[in-house]
Amino acid sequence: MAHRITDECTYCAACEPECPVSAISAGDSIYVIDENVCVDCIGYHDEPACVAVCPVDCIIKV
């Protein structure tokens, strides 16, 4: 499964550097997760790193 960033994203950029597979990039108004690249941090972290650092909890499981 992958994750998705919702429209509640504040464009703070906290998530982007945390992704171990570089699945997160800046979109026009919110950050975007490439669902074909996202591995839910399996093999890297105990929980998805982006979810752990998001200050507004706008990253959801797809």
Curated annotation (Swiss-Prot):
PROSITE patterns: 4FE4S_FER_1, 4FE4S_FER_2
Binding site for [4Fe-4S] cluster 1: C9, C12, C15, C54
InterPro entries per the UniProt record, alphabetical: 4Fe4S_Fe-S-bd (IPR017896), 4Fe4S_Fe_S_CS (IPR017900)
SUPFAM superfamilies: 4Fe-4S ferredoxins
Binding site for [4Fe-4S] cluster 2: C19, C38, C41, C50
GO molecular function terms noted in the UniProt entry: 4 iron, 4 sulfur cluster binding; metal ion binding
Names of the cofactor(s): [4Fe-4S] cluster
Binding note for cofactor: Binds 2 [4Fe-4S] clusters.
Pfam family, one: Fer4
Domain (4Fe-4S ferredoxin-type) ranges: 2-28, 29-62
Keywords tagged on the record: 4Fe-4S, Electron transport, Iron, Iron-sulfur, Metal-binding, Repeat, Transport
Superkingdom field: Bacteria
Chain's role: Ferredoxins are iron-sulfur proteins that transfer electrons in a wide variety of metabolic reactions.
Protein's name according to its UniProt entry: Ferredoxin-2
Species whose genome carries this gene: Chlorobaculum tepidum (strain ATCC 49652 / DSM 12025 / NBRC 103806 / TLS) (Chlorobium tepidum)
